[in-house]
Amino acid sequence: MQVLPPSSTGGPSRLFIMRPVATTLLMVAILLAGIIGYRALPVSALPEVDYPTIQVVTLYPGASPDVMTSAVTAPLERQFGQMSGLKQMSSQSSGGASVITLQFQLTLPLDVAEQEVQAAINAATNLLPSDLPNPPVYSKVNPADPPIMTLAVTSTAMPMTQVEDMVETRVAQKISQISGVGLVTLSGGQRPAVRVKLNAQAIAALGLTSETVRTAITGANVNSAKGSLDGPSRAVTLSANDQMQSAEEYRQLIIAYQNGAPIRLGDVATVEQGAENSWLGAWANKEQAIVMNVQRQPGANIISTADSIRQMLPQLTESLPKSVKVTVLSDRTTNIRASVDDTQFELMMAIALVVMIIYLFLRNIPATIIPGVAVPLSLIGTFAVMVFLDFSINNLTLMALTIATGFVVDDAIVVIENISRYIEKGEKPLAAALKGAGEIGFTIISLTFSLIAVLIPLLFMGDIVGRLFREFAITLAVAILISAVVSLTLTPMMCARMLSQESLRKQNRFSRASEKMFDRIIAAYGRGLAKVLNHPWLTLSVALSTLLLSVLLWVFIPKGFFPVQDNGIIQGTLQAPQSSSFANMAQRQRQVADVILQDPAVQSLTSFVGVDGTNPSLNSARLQINLKPLDERDDRVQKVIARLQTAVDKVPGVDLFLQPTQDLTIDTQVSRTQYQFTLQATSLDALSTWVPQLMEKLQQLPQISDVSSDWQDKGLVAYVNVDRDSASRLGISMADVDNALYNAFGQRLISTIYTQANQYRVVLEHNTENTPGLAALDTIRLTSSDGGVVPLSSIAKIEQRFAPLSINHLDQFPVTTISFNVPDNYSLGDAVQAIMDTEKTLNLPVDITTQFQGSTLAFQSALGSTVWLIVAAVVAMYIVLGILYESFIHPITILSTLPTAGVGALLALMIAGSELDVIAIIGIILLIGIVKKNAIMMIDFALAAEREQGMSPRDAIYQACLLRFRPILMTTLAALLGALPLMLSTGVGAELRRPLGIGMVGGLIVSQVLTLFTTPVIYLLFDRLALWTKSRFARHEEEA
């Protein structure tokens, strides 16, 4: 078990020490590359995470949830279910809309997934309803990358249909052309259309039916090829007046003749310009608006993209009528800028604190300048590598660099301290640099590679969390590697040129006082260490106690997934009684908007009512509440949410569910709350039996709050029970009945108007102003086989029933989603365990399954892999240390320091009231890499003293501890002060950074105190064990 002796001639550092110009120019090159890389790097909130999710939306106005499920969703699901690489498929079928969300494996390229989805849609086309207005439309959805900006377009003079047309054809297209913009979606649903509202009494009096009118309109408005004439000398293209463009033209359309007199559409219907869907609407601060959500392209710089949009807005506004106003409702870059700025400030603060601690220990300005140059050079040089790896400047990479501040200075400190020691003994600076750098080179390599080894398991973390922290781990590893290079090249070269006996011995009042203080501390430590070495078993029992305590703390500490951030945006869902109408829901959202906008923390509000790809039913509304910047409001987002919910509770007939928008969103569907739990069955009847029972139990749990379910089975249905025998005698088919109902009440899209700029629809419906409710069914007329007009009431009875407002599937089976939040005094781990315990008490049938979804599922996965992740980090470090030391024993001595770090980190988190979440776990893994450096520095010098000076193991480890006490204390304090700004952060994004800082500071404090005493004892214990093992082997060999 021999360690290779370090070279006294400078080793790999010799070339750089002897060639200062070349070394300086090399470092300048690294600096310039880093500066250029910094300017080229995009800025974002979190690393780029491509979450391969595709959403397929099919609209079929007028269709019930049951029809949408059986006629649209099911055929598509059967085709999608055959695709390879599909991880999960969920669907939501509501009145007139089917939304299928396809989540693929992370390893499947999104382009391949798109091709498979398109092929599946093509295969299902023949199975879909023939009168489907438009084929299914698919779009890429990245839940981890929400819109960067939300705009509202309003007008005080123009109707919203014209505003929507203007936004779609002019504003949205211009914004889409901006570099970095990926997708612009519109909400508000006010697309222009010609609406034909039939007068049921008028057409009945004339002996007509709605089907007669529909056939006349579709035949009168066509747009198809007509050919051309090709003569001997010229060619003539054929054209005709087959298109009708305006409501006035449709009014004049002759639909029938009676007694030789024409009957025009205007005689039996109100024909007007209106909206394609009158049951959709969006509002911005209570003013009706068209809302635009702008998403960026993958990899685009979110800051520059948002700046480009803002620069274009004045030009766009000038090109619009004066009554049209474009307003920025939310801009994610405001918080991203603030968060990145705060993190950069914390990085600068960490550098300043580290340099300060260096001066405190070295008490010499030239000696302080050297690491003061090495630290920023290592960090800046990292930016150059980040560019080549397609990384970005985000909260996690900046956190990595902030943490790296304490890491990278370690190498420089160890080199400077060792070289200074030889200079103080009287050697020339150049000789001291060569000797000191050569002697310490192996230690630097050990520190570097053992620390990088800890980060390796992070690269193999699965799912989206692994993708997220890959940039963090690699950025930190690159900074550490560059630091090692700088410490073995630039640092010894600068020591040889800048340090001297005179400068090191030059003292002032502060240096003399601090020197005396350090001498007393070292003397006290020496006395304490001597006593500890005399009582090894007591010390060993303390070490074992820390191991036991760390396990107990791990078991009992509250556990979470990801810190809840305050990004200044709140997503909300407003729920009203089932079967609430659009008008009723619009009125309720106005009442709620009045309450919300009175809150002093609220800056703006966007609300949406109606059924579309994200809103499942008319009795729910979506809200986006944009808060004032953090420095302009008194409370953080959770307090604002609590206050708003209390205020809205006073509005009768509505339930409000709010959750803060997060940079990391794993949920693929719009959710009412932060966490979801699903109940899946083979039939809707089974769900109707068990959902109420489970909900009743869950609502009694103190560990969860805001419990709600998307199971709504009390939607009013007017069931038309047709007497088939009577209908058959009259020559009336079920298709005739369905067509008549669809024409009257389905907002049926019956024709298309083509223009040079866009396409618009003709909508057919009955005018129900004078016959509201079920009375409108009495006006339906059908045509019998002999041409007579038959009232629907003569062949059918109307029954009122209840049915689900939406039918949801998970992997093709019925499912309901239960949403919940976690109260402040409980953790997500508590909530998950309570739900699982409750589920067991119900004794659910075998055909009913439960599963957590979204963030909760990711939490379970992360929690299950955390222990293995830490074990992998320890094993990786053991392997690296074993290779470096050519020993099975010494790595164990070094790794014995780890429980102390775990105890400190977990205690600090509990005292601070923080959960053990993913960020805190990353901090603990980093601690594994940091705290072992104390042992490495002790053992390196102890082994060298035993080998070169013939010291006994006890004397060697004792002298090594005293000799390395100062650099150990310096490096630990440097790492601690590097993490301190993260622990104390209070600005935007502080929730993300604070757990990392808390865990690292706590772990470093406890490990620093304990490992200075436990490591020497364990070193001697294993040394005796090695001698005993050798003697046993030797005895066996002699006996053999």
Swiss-Prot record:
Keywords: Cell inner membrane, Cell membrane, Membrane, Transmembrane, Transmembrane helix, Transport. Gene3D superfamilies: Multidrug efflux transporter AcrB pore domain, Multidrug efflux transporter AcrB pore domain like, Multidrug efflux transporter AcrB TolC docking domain, DN and DC subdomains, Multidrug efflux transporter AcrB transmembrane domain. It comes from Escherichia coli O157:H7. One of its GO terms (cellular component) is plasma membrane. GO terms for molecular function: xenobiotic transmembrane transporter activity. NCBIfam families: PRK10503.1 (NF007798), RND_permease_2 (NF033617). Belongs to the resistance-nodulation-cell division (RND) (TC 2.A.6) family. MdtB subfamily. Induction: The mdtABC operon is transcriptionally activated by BaeR. It is a multi-pass membrane protein. This is Multidrug resistance protein MdtB. The MdtABC tripartite complex confers resistance against novobiocin and deoxycholate. The chain crosses the membrane at residues 15-37, 345-362, 367-389, 396-418, 438-460, 472-494, 535-557, 867-889, 909-931, 968-990, 1000-1022. It is found in: Cell inner membrane. Part of a tripartite efflux system composed of MdtA, MdtB and MdtC. MdtB forms a heteromultimer with MdtC. InterPro entries: AcrB_DN_DC_subdom, Acrflvin-R, Multidrug-R_MdtB. It holds the Pfam family ACR_tran. HAMAP family: MdtB. Its main location: membrane.
